[in-house]
From Swiss-Prot:
GO terms for biological process: xylan catabolic process. Residues 1-19 form the signal peptide. This is Probable alpha-glucuronidase A. It comes from Aspergillus fumigatus (strain CBS 144.89 / FGSC A1163 / CEA10) (Neosartorya fumigata). It comes from the Eukaryota. GO terms for cellular component: extracellular region.
């Protein structure tokens, strides 16, 4: 039971808190009103049935003491002896409760890491199957209090699956691959950081949502992590995580015996290689006795692996598994294996087939402490994919699902995208193996195929930024991941409401507003990025951030759309295409094979159709594209006004931080909308029935203005500039001026200016009306926003600034002065003069 419903009406009108950085996340333990009667109804003592400081039970006692004080102003003493339930919280394991208190008969049956929480007036029992479970129960109790829930309860809960891990793609130099929240909290300059204070804070957050394992380094691993001095550093990290019930594991580079060990081979059948890995494993466990195990990316995207020596992927995984077996360690072996040099000229080639092609023949050949870690979809964390068919093809192999909290393809934390509704499309999908219920969530738990291991992994990539992920709102995804890994049937809306109450307080207006924004965010992003199963139409060859649909095709990466002037989509049918649909069990395969039974939202994933193909909605494919992109961008505009309605209810620091990102998202969603619509309008030659695409009556194109020191510039990709053209200063030392006489009716408008904010310079612009300064700004988004910057004029650097409520008279003279800096030539795309209520 995680839900917390405030029982005091006054809690819905709590005022603004002091400024907050976000460092505490959902563990901020904000004060909840608790008068004298409330205070007297709370326990006065905390009994921890383990006094060892490295014990999660001891930590539970400290968390309870701190939480009671911060949330309710209650000072509770902590002791490790006694079993009196009078005005006490007793926290410990089932075994300790039975031994020390001569009790425990009433404790329900618990699975590994499960706990029982019993609240009876001033008597609280928190009993875990393990010490980790006891800590989880303590966090559960505190979560209830922090949400104003003082209910008397008695219930037991156990995890959905034994493996609930997070992955960090941290590099030894301190950078983080696909990380948008600052540098690594673990590594710097090739070694483990001396200051690991952020690690302890991260451990608290993870434990509070019941995460029990972490891989601390990038799957594209650097063998230098295995040097003795770095092993010592890993031990320091593990010592910090241990009291929070979190076991540390590491990613391995398959070729380490050669690159680090100076062996002539890394063949997994070679005795010297086997011995080398055995010695490394022994050294690690000597330092970290409870190490979780290894994560391995092999024979994928240039990473070395066993197939170099004509060994199977199972051969490679089992080599590590046997080294770990004496210590109880686990190998998480990624199923993300594919050839990124395949030819699109072959109609039957399909990257989506790779996982099943590689792993299905190996089912039953992996050792029992190997878990195959499978991305939720067949390609790569796209805005919508079908469930990976590999889940339905490994009956005799342990599996785990791989999700992504970091928004690599989904806005990189510069766009609000609440991900659980996307994840639930996969977790709740019934693969119908052998015509029996086979939900993905029941397969990864081990339940469906009676497997001993299984579970969850999520790529998180927190960094040293005080918001952890680069955005306050993005933390809802980390919170929700932990919640779902424990209980995947939870409702996405209920989860985000709990997170909102814990993060922003109990004000009903805040809860309702942020719930609406969050639940609308993924559909909006899908609408303005890529829909109908076409994938996220981002630049797959560069940043994975802004729009560039052409980048999907014409290369070996296999994220093809096969779009031409007549048709679009991948034919993945057995009858005519790549035969991918046939990788599913019969009932699902039949659904996807037939265009009539394929859901519209996956039509272009499974079928190659004309732009004029009618959907079940009655719209053509191309008109759906146009409409969806306009709808998505319009929704993104509403996020700003919704958030602004909370101005007086949220501390200024977090309010402004979020507002900056939502304003940016509103502008960038229009960049996305126009780029995708212009691209397919140009490609298909089919007009928008509503005459919006290519028609912008409120715009003034920069290249049509009177230019002095500015020159026109043909932007590439062409669709990422209005009318395909921008302006740049004639040189990096030249100030540019663009002027125009405005031919709009006299009135009050929002004045928007679309420009490009490139990495490598911080240009400065000033906008004037009749020589009166309207506003000025600097191109410094690389210092403000989290997404990967670009050195080009493109869909990544394109953005908008808006000056609101500007009084304009017909015939006013608009002037923009741009001063270049570094490599950035003060680029401008267009000006838009928007009447109230109009979305450009």
């Amino acid at each position: 039971m995680w839900s917390g419903i405030p029982i005091f009406a006054l809690l819905s009108s709590i005022g603004i808190a002091a400024a907050e950085t976000g460092l505490d996340g959902w563990l901020r333990y904000a004060s909840v009103p608790c008068n004298g009667n409330c205070q007297r109804a709370l326990p006065s003592h905390i009994v921890t049935l383990n006094s060892t400081r490295s014990s999660p039970v001891y930590v539970a006692g400290q968390e309870l003491q701190d939480g009671l004080h911060q949330i309710l102003g209650k000072h509770a003493s902590v002791k490790s002896t006694g079993c009196s339930t009078d005005s006490s919280i007793i926290v410990g394991t089932v075994e300790a409760y039975r031994q020390v208190c001569n009790a425990g008969r009433q404790v329900p049956q618990l699975d590994v890491d499960g706990f029982w929480l019993s609240i009876r007036e001033k008597s609280v029992l928190i009993v875990g199957q393990s010490e980790r479970g006891a800590l989880y129960g303590a966090y559960e109790y505190l979560s209830m209090l922090a949400q104003g829930n003082f209910s008397q309860v008695s219930y037991a809960t156990s995890p959905h699956a034994p493996i609930r891990w997070v992955n960090q793609w941290d590099n030894m130099d301190g950078s983080i691959e696909r990380g948008y929240g600052g540098p690594s909290i673990f590594f710097k300059d090739g070694v483990i950081r001396q200051d690991l204070s952020r690690v302890q804070q991260y451990a608290r957050l993870l434990a509070s949502v019941r995460i029990n394992g972490i891989i601390v380094n990038n799957v594209n691993a650097n063998a230098s992590l295995l040097m003795p001095s770095n092993m010592d550093g890993l031990a320091r990290i593990a010592d910090i995580f241990r009291p929070y019930g979190i076991r540390v594991g590491i990613s391995l580079n398959f070729a380490s015996p050669s690159t680090l060990g100076n062996l002539s081979t890394y063949d997994p059948f070679d005795s010297s290689v086997i011995a080398w890995w055995g010695n490394v494993t022994d050294q690690l466990y000597a330092r970290i006795p409870d190490m979780a195990g290894y994560l391995v990316k092999a024979n994928s995207e240039g990473q070395p692996g066993p197939t170099t020596y004509n060994r199977t992927l199972a051969d490679g995984a089992n080599m590590f598994a046997r080294a770990l077996k004496p210590y109880g360690g686990v190998v998480m072996f990624r199923a993300f294996v594919y050839d990124h040099h395949i030819s699109e000229d072959n109609w039957y080639n399909d990257r989506a087939n790779a996982a099943v092609d590689f792993f299905k023949p190996l089912d039953g050949k992996f050792d029992d402490n190997v878990v195959v870690q499978i991305k939720y979809g067949p390609i790569d964390f796209q805005v919508r994919e079908p469930a990976s068919p590999l889940f339905a093809n490994l009956y005799k192999t342990n599996t785990a699902i791989e999700l992504q909290v970091t928004q690599e393809y989904l806005g990189q934390q510069s766009h609000l995208v609440y991900l659980p509704p996307l994840w639930q499309t996969i977790l709740g999908f019934d693969l119908r193996v052998d015509q029996k219920p086979s939900l993905v969530r029941d397969i990864i738990s081990g339940q469906r195929f009676d497997r001993p291991l299984g579970g969850w992994a999520a790529v998180v990539n927190v960094g040293t930024n005080s918001t952890w992920l680069g955005s306050h709102l993005a933390m809802s995804n980390l919170y929700a991941y932990g919640r779902l890994a424990w209980e995947p049937t939870l409702d996405s809306e209920d989860i985000v409401q709990d997170w909102i109450r814990l993060t922003f307080g109990l004000d009903r207006r805040i809860v309702d507003t942020l719930t609406q924004m969050s639940m609308e965010s993924w559909p909006a992003y899908e609408n303005y990025s890529g829909n109908l199963g076409i994938q996220t139409l981002t630049d797959i060859l560069y940043t994975h951030y802004g729009p560039n649909p052409a980048s999907q095709d014409g290369n070996g990466w296999g994220q093809w759309t096969r779009a031409d002037h007549l048709s679009i989509g991948m034919d993945r049918t057995v009858k005519n295409g790549t035969k991918f649909s046939g990788q599913y069990p019969a009932e699902v395969a039949a659904m996807y094979e037939n265009i009539e039974t394929t859901p519209d939202n996956l039509l272009l994933w499974f079928h190659h159709v004309n732009y004029t193909q009618r959907l079940h909605s009655g719209k053509t494919v191309i008109q759906h594209f146009y409409d969806a992109h306009y709808t998505g961008a319009e929704t993104a505009q509403t996020f700003v006004s919704q958030w602004e309605s909370l101005r007086e209810r949220i501390d200024a620091e977090r309010y402004q931080h979020v507002l900056t990102r939502l304003i940016y998202q509103a502008g960038h969603s229009i960049v996305w909308r126009d780029a995708i619509n212009n691209f397919y309008h140009n490609l298909s030659g089919i007009a928008d029935e509503k005459q919006r695409v290519g028609h912008h009556p409120w715009r003034v194109e920069a290249e049509d203005m009177q230019l002095d020191g500015y020159v026109p510039y043909a932007v590439s990709p062409f669709e990422t500039a209005s009318n395909y053209t921008a302006i740049v200063t004639a040189s990096n030392g030249t100030t540019g001026t663009a002027s125009a006489t405005l031919d709009f009716k006299t009135g009050t408008y929002d004045l928007g200016i679309n420009y490009y904010d490139m990495y490598g310079g911080k240009s400065h612009w000033t906008v004037y009306l009749n020589d009166r300064v309207v506003g000025q700004w600097q191109g410094n988004s690389e210092d403000v926003l989290s997404h990967t910057p670009s050195i080009y004029l493109d869909g990544h650097s394109a953005t908008r600034i808006t000056f609101r409520d500007v009084k304009i008279h017909k015939g006013d003279r608009l002037k923009i002065v741009g001063k270049p800096d570094g490599v950035e030539p003060a680029p401008l795309d267009y000006v838009v003069v928007l009447p109230p209520g109009i979305v450009d």
